[in-house]
UniProtKB/Swiss-Prot annotation:
Its EC number is 2.7.1.30. This is Glycerol kinase. One of its GO terms (biological process) is glycerol metabolic process. It comes from Bacillus cereus (strain ATCC 14579 / DSM 31 / CCUG 7414 / JCM 2152 / NBRC 15305 / NCIMB 9373 / NCTC 2599 / NRRL B-3711). GO terms for cellular component: cytosol. Activated by phosphorylation and inhibited by fructose 1,6-bisphosphate (FBP). Coiled coil: none annotated. One of its GO terms (molecular function) is ATP binding. Keywords: ATP-binding, Glycerol metabolism, Kinase, Nucleotide-binding, Phosphoprotein, Transferase. Homotetramer and homodimer (in equilibrium). It is an enzyme of class 2 (transferase). ADP binds at residues 12, 16, 266, 309, 410, 414. The keyword Mitochondrion does not apply.
Length: 496
């Protein structure tokens, strides 16, 4: 009987189930979107029960359409939108409030108070993160402070907290396993990434009872089994968990120290594997756990760019410059350069290394000769410049010079962008055959735990390149272009 690994990719707007075979190839997939709730400006919430329903639906669809029987599943891997927070009743398994999503800013005031009390340095040292509404800790505090009776129930040990991975493992196992992995725990603002424990001082700062927290386990391990009524009568091992960006790093087989990947989605997330040492950043990067496997923990530096693919959507939908995103490449290639035009797509502020949420988008160097083509090209180039900003910070912090950059996500289909990225970084850019690296990473973690794949060396062999983009631009030219970008950033920051 042929066996497969099932990957559950629980994202911000949809849930997906993807079946992988022994070669790491996609056999079949199913996807289901769910509702976004915006109760107030800047707030983003999901219904955790609806997310659970969407997961059950995609599992059923994927298996039936692929004609794969439940007993053919060797293991389940889970990857998830990180930081999104669920608090549920231990007895009924019902959430006491909506899931508060990573993007939601509803805890910004709590963060300001914590900063004013002088906690920033302690948080940075212990967690590798900044005090920000992005991370889970303040979201848990908000739920306990704002939902009637929640704090009392939590103090009595009746409530559980989890990021989305924990919630799904709890539901799949019928409430038998309350766990998370190192990569997800490292995004909560409550976990000490050095001694790998929930931290009493951080919990006290956030007034979160320890009894709510899941057990933290390696990213590749059997956490429990599916309860038969949730998996068509089968008890399948739930064997791999990692947050989406860390899973993509694993799926790209970036196992060596200094290997890095950049995911071009709505925003960009760039992670560099720093091996077994947690590198503290001096340049606005986050220090995070990549994964824990075989008794060892790998760390990573992470840079976040807020606007990437969404800038291309803006050209299409907001500026109506083309009907299909793929046309952006055609227009950009019609001109030799941007003719001195720079677009800074700071629509929601700037991320790494600037961390400025007040600044807004800008355009510079426009003349009477500027055309639509120049404008589109400048917008695409801005993705590459922002990536260089992050890479410069990574190289400065880690002391590691990048040899190649592996890429994934929607925008990597754009050959113009990938070539320009290679030129501006002066390193080769490698695009893999399988672009679903996040789901693949979760599948690999699960497959290793159940012996479906032998080891990381076997996985490394399965990474196949679709195309390698080599830098050909003269150093002088790329330096001048990048200097222009830095000027544009400074000017943008000055206009508030």
């Amino acid at each position: 009987m042929k066996k497969y690994i099932l990957s559950l990719d629980q994202g911000t707007t949809s849930s997906r189930a993807i079946l992988f075979n022994k070669k790491g190839e996609i056999v079949h997939s199913a996807q289901k979107e769910f509702t976004q709730h915006f109760p107030k400006p800047g707030w983003v919430e999901h219904n955790a029960q609806e997310i659970w329903g969407s997961i059950l639906a995609v599992i059923a669809t994927c298996l039936s359409e692929a004609d794969v029987k439940p007993e053919q599943i060797a293991g389940i891997g889970i990857t998830n939108q990180r930081e999104t927070t669920v608090v549920w009743d231990k007895t009924t398994s019902k959430p006491i409030y909506n899931a508060i999503v990573w993007q939601s800013r509803q805890t910004a005031e709590i963060c300001d108070e914590l900063k004013e009390k002088g906690y920033s340095e302690m948080v940075r040292e212990k967690t590798g993160l900044l005090i920000d509404a992005y991370f889970s800790g303040t979201k848990v505090k908000w739920i306990l402070d704002n939902v009637e009776g929640a704090r009392e129930k939590a103090e009595n040990g009746d409530l559980l907290f989890g990021t989305i991975d924990s919630w799904l493992v709890w539901k799949l196992s019928g409430g038998k396993a309350h766990v998370t992995d190192y990569s997800n725990a490292s995004r909560t603002l409550m976990f000490n990434i050095h001694d790998l424990q929930w931290d009493d001082e951080l919990l006290e700062m956030l007034t979160v009872p320890k009894s709510m927290l899941p057990e933290v386990r390696p990213s590749s391990e059997i956490y429990g089994e599916t309860i038969d009524y949730h998996f068509f009568g089968q008890n399948v091992p739930i064997a791999g968990v990692a947050g989406d960006q860390q899973a993509a790093l694993f799926g790209q087989a970036c196992f060596g120290e200094g290997m890095a990947k950049n995911t071009y989605g709505t925003g960009c997330f760039m992670l560099m594997n720093t091996g077994e040492k947690a590198v503290a950043s001096e340049h606005g990067l986050l220090t995070t756990i990549a994964w824990g496997i075989d008794g060892k923990v790998n760390y990573a530096l992470e840079g976040s760019i807020f606007v990437a693919g969404s800038a291309i959507q803006w050209l299409r939908d907001g500026m109506r410059m083309f009907k299909d995103a793929s046309e952006s490449e055609v227009y950009a290639s019609r001109v030799e350069s941007t003719d001195g035009v720079y677009v800074v797509p700071a629509f929601v502020g700037l991320g790494t290394p600037y961390w400025d949420s007040e600044v807004r988008g800008a355009m510079f160097g426009v003349t009477r000769g500027t055309t639509k083509e120049h404008f589109i090209r400048a917008t695409l180039e801005s993705l590459a410049y922002q990536t260089k900003d992050v890479l410069c910070a990574m190289e400065a912090d880690s002391g590691i010079e990048l040899k190649t950059l592996r890429v994934d996500g929607g925008a990597v289909k754009n050959n113009f962008l990938m070539k320009f990225q290679s030129d501006i970084l002066d390193v080769p850019v490698e695009r893999p055959v399988i672009n679903e690296t996040t789901a693949l990473g979760a599948a690999y973690l699960a497959g290793l735990a159940v012996g479906y794949w032998k080891n990381q060396d076997e996985i490394k062999e399965q990474w196949h390149m679709d195309k390698r983009f080599e830098p050909t631009m003269e150093a002088k030219t790329s330096e001048e272009l990048y200097a222009g970008w830095k000027k544009a950033i400074e000017a943008t920051k000055a206009f508030k």
